[in-house]
């Protein structure tokens, strides 16, 4: 059986669909190489002295782990000189990073969470990198934050790498979701699954149950029904899964179905949610929809949310289509009753 590398897949997709421009193909390959380098650092762990806190905080007010900083620098260094990008934005940086004048500038914008789930680093649980690619609205002109503030429907590519028992790259360029596994001996990502599809129904949900008392009534209603099992209104038993790493939880859902929820809660009512729209929710929503699932903030499709700032937060409900639609319907019903 012929093994298909990431490069070959991208070239053949361009021939079939004419949707992957050469600059985009090269950009995706550079991001993949950066993910390989991050994977190597993650795998070395304590042997390389990269575990533990970096002693600094990021723009989100979160404590940075050493690997957060390393992963961010790897992605910046790998992508700044190739001529594919106009600018980059990261969870770990307050402002965007414009490509220095000493390098040619391209027509794309790259956003990323360099190391999602970093609270799991020291306990050796799967973590990952999430990325999103947009067109630069005004190629050749000075980049502003407004150039990044495009709805998720404008993404030209999205994906993530999960660093677990294997290093896996999951990618969409708008023609379905495809999975690549890192062959460490060959040093390349190899296509191992094509056209991933999420079952429309599920018996698994992923949510942090310790926050239940803080949720809005529609979310509590849905979870109460799941917990009631086959004796409740759903007529079936559900299992709960929660890894506290969005990459790992979403990867499980892409693999076997389920629903992932990180909803608004009343502890910080002024915030729409916890997860970041631009480089967490949007790329994951694109992947989920391309695999036949759904992704909303409880009210509207995540990909339709118009960003207002770079580090905007959003409530996230994504996964198996029928389950996501049920939770969204509960939100609409509650809003109608309040109105």
Curated annotation (Swiss-Prot):
Pathways involved: Carbohydrate biosynthesis; gluconeogenesis
CDD domains in the cross-refs: FBPase (cd00354)
Catalytic activity, EC: 3.1.3.11
GO MF annotations in UniProt: fructose 1,6-bisphosphate 1-phosphatase activity; magnesium ion binding
Cofactor: Mg(2+)
UniProt catalytic activity: beta-D-fructose 1,6-bisphosphate + H2O = beta-D-fructose 6-phosphate + phosphate
Source organism, top-level taxon: Bacteria
Ranges that cross the membrane: none
Disulfide bonds: none
Top EC class for this record: hydrolase
Subunit structure: Homotetramer.
Family note: Belongs to the FBPase class 1 family.
Entries under HAMAP family matching the protein: FBPase_class1
Annotated protein name in UniProt: Fructose-1,6-bisphosphatase class 1
UniProt source species: Cupriavidus pinatubonensis (strain JMP 134 / LMG 1197)
């Amino acid at each position: 059986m012929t093994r298909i590398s990431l490069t070959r897949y991208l070239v053949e997709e361009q021939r079939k669909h004419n949707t992957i421009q050469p600059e985009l193909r090269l950009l995706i390959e550079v991001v993949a190489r950066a993910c390989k380098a991050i994977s190597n650092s993650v795998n070395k762990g304590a042997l390389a002295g990269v575990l533990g806190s970096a002693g600094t905080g990021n723009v989100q007010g979160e404590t940075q782990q050493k690997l957060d900083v390393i992963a961010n620098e790897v992605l910046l260094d790998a992508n700044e000189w190739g001529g594919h990008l106009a600018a980059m934005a990261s969870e770990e940086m307050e402002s965007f990073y414009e490509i220095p004048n000493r390098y040619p500038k391209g027509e794309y914008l790259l956003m990323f969470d360099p190391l999602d789930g970093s609270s799991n680093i020291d306990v050796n649980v799967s973590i990952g990198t999430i990325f999103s690619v947009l067109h630069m609205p005004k190629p050749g002109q000075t980049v502003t934050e407004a150039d990044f503030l495009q709805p998720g429907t404008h993404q030209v590519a999205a994906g993530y790498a999960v660093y677990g028992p294997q290093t896996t790259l999951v990618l969409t360029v708008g023609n379905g979701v495809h999975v690549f596994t890192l062959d460490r001996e060959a040093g390349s990502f190899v296509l191992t699954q094509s056209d991933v599809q999420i079952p429309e129904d599920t018996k698994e949900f992923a949510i942090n149950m310790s926050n239940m008392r803080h949720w809005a009534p529609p979310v509590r209603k849905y979870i109460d029904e799941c917990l009631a099992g086959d004796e409740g209104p759903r007529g079936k038993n559900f299992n709960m899964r929660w890894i506290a790493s969005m990459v790992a939880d979403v990867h499980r859902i892409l693999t076997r179905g389920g629903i992932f929820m990180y909803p608004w809660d009343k502890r910080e009512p002024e915030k729409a949610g916890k997860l970041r729209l631009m480089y967490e929710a949007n790329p994951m929503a694109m992947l989920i929809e391309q695999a036949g699932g759904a992704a909303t903030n409880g009210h509207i499709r995540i990909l339709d949310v118009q960003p207002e700032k770079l580090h905007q937060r959003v409530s996230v409900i994504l996964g198996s289509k029928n389950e996501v639609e049920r939770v969204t319907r509960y939100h609409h019903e509650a809003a109608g009753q309040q109105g």
